Curated annotation (Swiss-Prot):
Protein name: GTPase Der
Record's function text: GTPase that plays an essential role in the late steps of ribosome biogenesis.
NCBIfam families noted in UniProt: GTPase_EngA, small_GTP
Limits of the KH-like domain: 354-437
Keyword Repeat assigned: yes
Subunit structure: Associates with the 50S ribosomal subunit.
GO biological process, one term: ribosome biogenesis
PANTHER family per UniProt: GTPASE DER
Chloroplast found in the keyword field: no
Signal peptide: none
Binding positions for GTP 2 per the UniProt entry: 184-191, 231-235, 296-299
A single MF term (Gene Ontology): GTP binding
Length: 437
């Protein structure tokens, strides 16, 4: 499993800026307003060949400059699950009571954790000089960085990663079993589905949302194939009371997605697709995992012969450009379509791993170009000479052409649709790269 690095600190010390700097992206909203990071961000990263998960714990401005119960809980959960912690303070404003509160938690409760003390916003020599006084936090001399400009970040991150055990050799998933993450909001029936498949009450199941707290692995053997079912706590809507649980569930979901081949995303048939469901789906797609939507509790819906088609059509419309995800209607209670879901997930997993010969791909390309020529742009025509598949853990295709700038989005979508139809990539994200040749 990839090591998890948590960014911890009071609001507005630059956690999101450092998060974006390390991942070289602008995925989090960065704003001077304290607590502007609305959701917990957990993303995969890579530095000098070493892979890891990076977590921005976010936070909001507590009242009276003391740690609120919710913020304390989410910070504690972040540290508890992390392999290393980057504790960030603002070098320009110096240590506050809140910084010292967090420092005490780290030193007393998590003294065995790998903790790296970082002074951010060190963007001139005077601030660097004043930052030396931060040792009164109880830690050794801090790393001096500027997340905004990148100064000092590389050296700090290198030390963090060198302190962590190499994940190679520790992975228990290096086998041929198909790994399925059972995902969804609380109370959609995740544990009930796993119980239905295993024929055992392995999990505690109740009507109280969020009964299952951690990811639990189960092994299912079916038709000579072995499946690892990763059952997780669901994603919650954000409330102050549930902030800690919501964060923890989000983390468990992200780590389960990292491990899986296919994400089984359960919806409540009575509620349909909600924003939290879309969040889970996008997390899986961003990580290039296979996705299968299970509309659970279908037995509780009043229906006729047209209900399932109407539901599917509406769902595909909501999904938009990711409407390639298959949909199966299930009932964990009656076991309706539960094993069909496993069989479909197996097909997705196998197709996600398939390697297509270059000759077959170029035969496909010629047939596709005969059906539709790329549109001209500024009087020039895109000419795709040949294509090939790049070795990866998901389908990646390279198209060699005269000028990638001539590619229109409409033609890209047409090519992707043709690829899906020709090679059965339903439920599988595809990466297409257009290279000059």
């Amino acid at each position: 499993m990839k090591p998890l690095i948590a960014l911890v600190g009071r609001p507005n010390v630059g956690k999101s800026t450092l998060f974006n700097r390390i991942l070289r992206q602008k995925s989090a909203i960065v704003d001077p307003t304290p607590g502007v990071t609305r959701d917990r961000h957990i993303s995969p990263g890579e530095w000098q060949g070493k892979q890891f998960l990076l977590m921005d714990t976010g936070g909001y401005a507590p009242e009276n400059d003391t740690l609120s119960k919710a913020m304390l809980e989410q910070t504690m959960r972040a540290i508890e699950d992390a392999d290393a912690v980057i504790f960030i303070v603002d070098a320009r404003s110096g240590l506050t009571y809140l910084d010292l509160d967090i420092a005490k938690i780290l030193q007393k409760t998590f003294k065995d954790k790998k903790i790296f003390f970082v002074a951010n916003k060190v963007d001139n020599p005077q601030v660097a000089l004043e930052a030396q006084s931060l040792v009164k936090s109880g830690f050794t001399e801090p790393y001096l960085i500027s997340a905004r400009d990148g100064a000092g970040v590389a050296d700090m991150l290198e030390d963090v990663l060198n302190s962590l055990p190499c994940p190679e050799g520790e992975e228990i998933e290096e086998d041929d079993s198909i790994k399925l993450a059972v995902l969804g909001r609380p109370n959609v029936g995740k544990s009930s589905l796993v119980n239905a498949l295993l024929g055992t009450e392995r999990h505690i199941v109740s009507d109280v949302p969020g009964t299952t707290r951690d990811a639990i692995d189960s092994v299912l053997k079916r038709n000579g194939e072995e499946y690892v079912l990763i059952d997780t706590a669901g994603l919650r809507k954000r409330t102050k009371i549930d902030a800690g649980i919501e964060f923890y569930s989000s983390l468990r979901t992200a780590r389960a997605i990292e491990r899986c081949d296919v994400a089984l995303v359960l919806l409540d048939a009575r509620l349909g697709l909600e924003s939290q469901d879309m969040k889970i789906i996008h997390m899986a797609i961003e990580r290039k995992k296979g996705v299968l939507i299970l509309v659970n509790k279908w037995d509780l819906v009043e229906k006729d012969s047209k209900t399932s088609k109407a539901f599917t059509d509406n769902l595909q419309n909501q999904l938009g450009n990711i409407g390639y995800i298959p949909v199966i209607f299930t009932s964990a209670l009656t076991k309706k379509n539960c094993y069909r879901a496993i069989d479909t997930a197996a097909e997705i997993a196998l197709n996600r791993r398939q390697k297509i010969s270059t000759s077959n791909l170029n035969r496909f390309l010629q047939e596709t170009l005969t059906m539709r020529h790329p549109a001209t742009k500024s009087g020039k025509e895109l000419k795709i000479k040949y294509m090939t598949q790049i070795d990866s853990d998901h389908p990646v295709f390279a198209f060699f052409c005269n000028d990638p700038e001539l590619l229109e989005n409409n033609f890209r979508r047409f090519l992707e649709k043709r690829l899906r139809e020709s090679f059965d990539f339903a439920g599988i994200p595809i990466t297409m790269r257009f290279l000059r040749k």
